[in-house]
């Protein structure tokens, strides 16, 4: 059940437009919300402000559609909630995603922003001065006046100058050259719970200008446990959150933990088994080229399939056997139309196996997702660290399918 409120700031009009507010939210928390920015409020000249306005309007459109999707209960069997896959083992486990308090708080934060857009806008900027986020360049940038104005360092420049591994460079070159085709086209389609399209097909300035980070490309000890095709074929962008365009520290005196953005992973790749101390979710927005193309494995930290091999006051080291008989049943297939929403509780071990053999032009295709983390404000849990698992037999090397896998799980503090 929902009731009606009014809000401004939609892309297509300055007129107040009716919006449905989920009934688990308190109107008093939404109306006239007070925002404290993370860092200084960005300042722009009148000439530059026109580009910020375009980017802001597309950001509001993205956030509003995301919140509406999460609270869409038309076909979920839930109340004010979409349904999410949370564990792929033992036939798969699901839950009403809005049963989680962290998700309720994130949706509240989004409605506080879109219903007080003018007040929240003071915390919004292009982050054109940040050196570690990049533009995909190419056709995506050439079609966006905002991205051209920001003029970020491009993926091409990044892979040429900052990536030293030659194989990763080659994967990065292909990723860069095909990025526009990966995020646009008819196979990019929103799940049915979304009220409208928020892909690069509909919001070209946001997708070109958000600021992308190929987070695994550079050399690091962590990437010894990664695959080169992921290092050169994966990137994410954040539009709302500590590292994003909209950086809010507090709303009404309460810390904001939401991080909302998008991810792109090239096909023919296995995003390695990993975990983190912060809950995370994905909405798949790709129509698959064949059945079982997009496979996810998610195993919760208290699963009977996991055994503890070592622990101290901060970390629990665990193992599980991905090579056991019928291990393929630990994976579930998804798409924009089947199990489109996945939610990973803190310390859920997960991986994404993306097949490309059924694609006519696999170099031009990727899985594209709406992405979010919900409680990133609690720094006690080292929210920014994604911990890659490793081979139990060969520690320090990537964990492959078909073997015993070893992971370090953070002892989460509440």
UniProtKB/Swiss-Prot annotation:
Signal peptide per UniProt: 1-18
Function: Catalyzes the cleavage of dimethylsulfoniopropionate (DMSP) into dimethyl sulfide (DMS) and acrylate.
Induction or repression: The maximal level of transcription is observed under anaerobic conditions in the presence of acrylate or methacrylate. Anaerobiosis is necessary but not sufficient to increase the expression.
Catalyzed reactions: S,S-dimethyl-beta-propiothetin = acrylate + dimethyl sulfide + H(+)
Molecular-function GO term, any one: lyase activity
Gene3D superfamilies: Jelly Rolls
Primary localization: periplasm
Protein name per the record: Dimethylsulfoniopropionate lyase DddY
Keyword Signal: yes
Disulfide bonds: none
Compartment(s) where it occurs, according to its Swiss-Prot or TrEMBL record: Periplasm
First-tier enzyme category under EC: lyase
EC number, as in UniProt: 4.4.1.3
Top-level taxon in the UniProt lineage: Bacteria
One GO term describing the cellular component: periplasmic space
Source organism: Shewanella woodyi (strain ATCC 51908 / MS32)
The family this protein is said to belong to: Belongs to the DMSP lyase DddY family.
Oxidoreductase is among the record's keywords: no
This protein's UniProt keywords: Lyase, Periplasm, Signal
């Amino acid at each position: 059940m929902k009731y009606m409120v009014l809000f401004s700031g939609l892309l297509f009009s300055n007129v107040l437009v009716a919006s449905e507010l989920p009934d688990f939210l308190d109107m008093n928390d939404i109306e006239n919300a007070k925002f404290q920015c993370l860092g200084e409020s960005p300042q722009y000249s009148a000439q530059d402000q026109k580009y910020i306005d375009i980017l802001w309007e597309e950001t509001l459109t993205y956030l509003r559609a995301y919140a509406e999707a999460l609270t869409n209960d038309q076909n979920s069997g839930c109340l004010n909630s979409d349904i999410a896959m949370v564990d792929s083992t033992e036939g798969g486990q699901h839950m009403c995603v809005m049963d989680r308090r962290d998700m309720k708080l994130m949706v509240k934060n989004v409605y506080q922003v879109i219903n007080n857009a003018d007040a929240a806008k003071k915390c919004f900027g292009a982050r054109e001065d940040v050196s570690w986020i990049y533009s995909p360049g190419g056709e995506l940038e050439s079609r966006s006046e905002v991205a051209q104005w920001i003029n970020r360092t491009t993926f091409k420049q990044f892979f040429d100058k900052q990536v030293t591994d030659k194989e990763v460079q080659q994967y990065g070159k292909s990723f860069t050259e095909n990025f526009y085709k990966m995020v646009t086209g008819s196979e990019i389609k929103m799940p049915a719970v979304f009220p409208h399209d928020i892909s690069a097909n509909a919001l070209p300035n946001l997708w070109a200008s958000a600021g992308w980070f190929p987070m695994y490309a550079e050399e690091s000890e962590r990437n010894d446990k990664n695959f080169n095709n992921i290092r050169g074929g994966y990137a994410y962008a954040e539009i709302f959150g500590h590292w994003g365009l909209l950086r809010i520290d507090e709303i009404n005196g309460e810390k904001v933990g939401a991080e909302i953005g998008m991810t792109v992973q090239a096909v023919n790749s296995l995003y390695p088994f990993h975990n983190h101390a912060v809950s995370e979710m994905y909405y798949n927005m790709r129509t698959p080229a064949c059945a079982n193309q997009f496979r996810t494995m998610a195993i919760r930290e208290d699963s009977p399939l996991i055994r503890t091999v070592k622990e101290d006051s901060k970390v629990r080291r665990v193992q599980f056997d991905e090579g056991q008989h019928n291990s393929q049943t630990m994976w579930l297939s998804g798409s924009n139309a089947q199990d489109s929403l996945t939610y990973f509780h803190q310390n859920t071990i997960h991986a994404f196996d993306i097949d490309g053999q059924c694609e006519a032009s696999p170099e031009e295709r990727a899985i594209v997702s709406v992405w979010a983390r919900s409680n990133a404000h609690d720094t006690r849990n080292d929210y920014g660290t994604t911990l890659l698992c490793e081979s139990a037999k060969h520690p320090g090397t990537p964990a492959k399918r078909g073997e015993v896998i070893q992971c370090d799980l953070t002892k989460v503090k509440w």
